[in-house]
Amino acid sequence: MNVETSCYALNKPFGVLSHFTDEGGHPGLGSLSLDLPKDVYPVGRLDRDSEGLILLSNDSSFIHELLEPSNGHSRTYMVQVEGDVNSGQIEALKSPMDLRIKKQVHRTKSCEAKLLPTPVVEDRIPPIRERKSIPTNW
């Protein structure tokens, strides 16, 4: 039996979970009224308070190829932080670090990090936080 595979690109909005069901009073992708087949699933995830590209597919081989860490697919994130950022902080971010999650320690891999010029981004609801007395960096 041949099943037609499909892949969709979605700009996941801020405040929406990366799975289709609502949870804890927060809307999931299913609340977006997308006209998608029932057999597609997110390829990875973005946190609820993140926005950006998320792929959806029904091709399990494709999903596995992208998510399997040993395949070495990189990801790029633009992050806004409060306060001035210095080179020492950037270097620390590039290095592996230990994260404690549910009483277990997980070691991150090293990564690339750099300061970016402030991007032009679309308005969103809620607005991106800007405070006059606290600088931000990307």
Label for each model-derived stretch:
Residues M1-W138:
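RNA pseudouridine synthases
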